[in-house]
Regions:
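Glycine/proline-enriched, intrinsically flexible loops and inter-domain linkers
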Residues: 1-223
């Protein structure tokens, strides 16, 4: 059912609707800034946080007395995993690795928190198995051993008289090391700097918030 999706059947927005879509997505809870939550925490406690004034794609913790810091990130898009557990979990590991690398670090190792529904449900157990296989495949690619983690089953609720499981969520936690002199930050460094887009650019809206929430298309392949 998922792979019967055809993007050509999705309405192409005009300029007027495009503005409406942009406003809708910018205010959506899954996209809107969470700054009002995390800025309430005193991030300077212990003076180890190197990301407070110089934000990176990963959190950076200073290792005092050395030239190194620790980069940390957590990533998962459960919609990708629901669509394709193997590929979706590969994407989660890949995103974590990118966050470490784009912060100036080298990925070292992975932990995880695997959240699924009832394992006695055949589809749920299949999702679980394929997610582990996807994680294993990606971790071997990045040479990041899984040092530990936990599994949480029976994440479900009764909705309209029917038991519904959460979307499968294999959350990936990754750590890496950063040479403090090479920490990368999010901001552009100089006016007029050249910006490069790396990799192949494809016309892909699969599993997007736009498709899922705005257009109401709940099933589409993972990107």
């Amino acid at each position: 059912q998922t792979f019967e999706f055809n993007k050509d059947n999705v309405k192409e927005p005009d300029i007027k609707e495009a503005k409406k879509i942009a406003e809708y997505l910018a205010s959506h809870p899954n996209i809107a800034s969470k700054r009002w939550v995390y800025e309430q925490y005193d991030s300077m406690v212990g003076t180890k946080n190197m990301s407070t004034n110089r934000p990176s794609d990963a959190g950076i913790a200073n290792v005092k007395g050395t030239n190194n810091a620790i980069a940390m990130t957590c990533d998962c898009n459960s919609r990708y995993v629901y669509s394709d557990p193997f590929v979706g979990t590969q994407i989660a590991v890949s995103e974590a690795a990118r966050n470490i690398v784009c912060s100036g670090g080298d990925p070292l190792a992975v932990t995880n928190c695997l959240n699924f529904g009832n394992p006695y449900n055949e589809n749920t157990y299949w999702q679980f198995v394929k997610a582990i296989e996807g994680m294993s495949s990606a971790c071997r690619k990045f040479n990041t051993p899984v040092t530990g983690g936990n599994v949480s089953f029976y994440n479900q609720a009764v909705m309209n008289g029917k038991t519904e499981a959460v979307y499968p969520s294999p959350v990936i936690g990754m750590v890496g090391t950063v040479d403090k002199s090479k920490q990368m930050t999010l901001d552009f460094k100089t006016q007029g700097a050249t910006i490069y887009m790396l990799g192949e650019i494809v016309d892909d809206i699969n599993c997007s918030e736009y498709l899922y929430s705005y257009r109401g298309v709940k099933l589409s392949p993972a990107p």
